[in-house]
Amino acid sequence: RMALARSAEQSIDARYYIWQRDSTGLSLLKELKAAADRGVRVRLLVDDNGTPDLDAELAALNTLANFEVRVFNPFSLRSPRLLSYPLDFPRINRRMHNKSFTVDGVATIVGGRNIGDIYFARDTEVQYSDFDVLATGAVVDDVAADFDAYWNSASAYPHELLVTPPTDLSALDAASAEAEADPDTAAYAQSVSDSRLVQGILGHTLALDWVPVTLLSDDPRKALADAPAGTLVATALAPLVGQARQSIDVISAYFVPGREGTERLAFAARQGLRVRVLTNSLEATDVLPV
């Protein structure tokens, strides 16, 4: 993501459910600011449930000429936000879990990984092994259109409507200094820069697998319980299971197929299809009821 941000010439569109205020999160915000400072249009869409400690930094970024921040389905109370749940639970319980990072309309990263130390092996005690994909080609246009749908939805609020814009950027400067002061930051950054993936991106030698891809995404109106019938991912996945001819592979941290989903997958297996499901063990999950 940093390599793509540094190479951006026209635009960066980023949206995430969780963006943590830690070394990884602050470092990537710094890269987005640097891109905006050199004239790149930056749009950042975050879910309000996953950014509880970033109001000051996001408010500062939102004042920059080329930087715009919007918040999806914001809480009624800024602090503590959890108090909003009993006041407006039906709405507040509908969150935006979409994650994408699109640069110049030519490359995008999509998948399950949020932004934070625990998602990038930066935390020494906890690691979330989420899966994402770097993509180029026609699917980037689909991701861009989906981003625009969420960005322009009735549930996406300009950050300045929620938090009073700051008169200076001291909070942002302090956050950047905090990230740089971490003694392990330089070594971690170097190890990432030396990785085969980043070197392939920077050297334009990264080998891509060219395959047909279809993007499925919920209609953003689901946050208002107003999504038209047939516009949710769960609805779109059901017929795909029936159309499979050889195999079905599922990767999900929270695998809850329900009765209908279980029956569809079991039927496919009985018909001779190879069905593989990769999910958390009981020891690894962070949501025990799942």
Residue ranges and their predicted role:
Residues R1-K99, V103-V290:
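Charged, low-complexity intrinsically disordered terminal segments
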